Amino acid sequence: VEPLAPHEKVYVDSEFAEDENHGELGCEECHGGNPEDPNWKTAHEGVVKDPSYPDASSSCGQCHEDIAEHYETSLHISLAAFRKVTENRLGSDPAALDALSQAREAHCSGCHSSCGQCHISRPESVEGGLLEAHLFQKRPPMFQVCTACHGSRVEKEYLGKNAGIPPDIHKEKYFKCNKCHTAQQMHGDGNNYGNRYEVENGPKCIDCHEEIYSDKSENAAQHNDHKDKLSCQVCHSMPYKNCYACHVGKDDQGLAYFKTKGSILNFKIGINPAQNEKRPEKFVTVRHVPVDPNTFKFYSDIRLKNFDTLPTWKLATPHNIRRQTPQNKTCNACHGNAQLFLGKNDVKPEYADANAKVIVPPEMVPPKVDE
């Protein structure tokens, strides 16, 4: 997404004052400050740029109490998944945890998204700025908010920006993010989830494609044969981005940065590392995440001592769904095709232990069938 011009970031349209809901509020009722003070410097004392972060109860929560009640458990606010995985890999050393906290504050916290950073302004991670001159957006605009943050993977997959890979079939049907990812999911439900795949009201393909197992479906036999054995993406997604070896730090001016050793487009089927009642499938698509034992080494020489406790190939739900794909063109396009599956040779020897439960041994690759 293109950065906004300086004046665009702060311009408030007079039309906002005519809003029958939010326009009736004085600026100070959300942002603080003293409108009665004739001195502009002292009048701005206590002014808050984003009244909805880190606590929305005194701003949005005054009217939207039912949503603000669950605010802190929304993964967009809590970033619980990042805390969980980094602390699991790091261990319990207090000094290391303190250094990790500094690293998270410098790098991870910029990815949170508050009420305001979806409904009023762009997220801070893309330099912020008002969306529509401070007019509240009930439905956050997809390209200025959703893909502004979820750009390198989701946007490129969904819009077909990866070379040689077509866009998601749902994009061709003009679906926006909220068609699958509802407000209820985004706002949280009060439960402290460890990652997005645990969210109870998260999207499921079957929510819309409920007929695929019925006799009326032309592919009912294939869908029933593979039910609970494969995730939908195993058959219906295309190659997606996999990143490697991310390292974070600060430059000479104290500005946070990150760099990786690159990325590749690939497609791999692995053993489900998060198999549960909600996701019972044995085989799922897996994506390589760019964590490295020395990702946070810049900060007090942190090394992720328990690196092998979690895989570097994680459960993935790529946003490049197609009805027909190379792997579902025929049965034996997948059956007996070991190259589609995450094998021992796809993983560096030093990461073999971390991915032991995800790697598909040769004997588990489905054999060829008579077609």
Regions found by a protein language model. Name each.
Residues 1-126, 135-371:
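C-type cytochrome heme-c attachment and multiheme electron-transfer modules
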